[in-house]
């Protein structure tokens, strides 16, 4: 918690050339590249990627649907699915969906 508070205090100090919302794979890379010659603020609503199951490929089974690392979104019911709604896992952690997908492409 102290690290998060420290990060928030640093974020509130000054102006930024770029603000990137979402620290998934693309957001992290974009912030890194933009900050080479400018200032960039990277915002992420989720927490640290310190959950053991995000480090093990088979761990995606324990990540998807887990409110600690997944937003828990569902699709709208679809007629072609007999009115069912499907789970739509989205990463709520640094690294985004790449942290919870078990390295599956």
Question: What residues fall within each predicted segment?
Answer:
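N-terminal redox-cofactor-binding region of secreted/periplasmic oxidoreductases
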Residues: 1-105
């Amino acid at each position: 918690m102290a690290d998060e508070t420290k990060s928030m205090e640093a974020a509130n100090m000054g102006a930024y050339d770029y603000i990137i919302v979402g620290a998934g794979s693309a957001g992290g890379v974009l912030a890194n590249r933009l900050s080479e010659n400018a200032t960039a603020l990277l915002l992420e609503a989720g927490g640290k990627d310190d959950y053991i199951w995000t480090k093990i490929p088979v761990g995606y089974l324990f990540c998807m649907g887990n409110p600690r690392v997944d937003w828990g979104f569902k699709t709208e019911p679809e007629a072609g699915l007999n009115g069912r709604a499907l789970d739509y896992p989205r990463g709520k952690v640094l690294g985004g969906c790449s942290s919870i997908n078990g390295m599956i492409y």
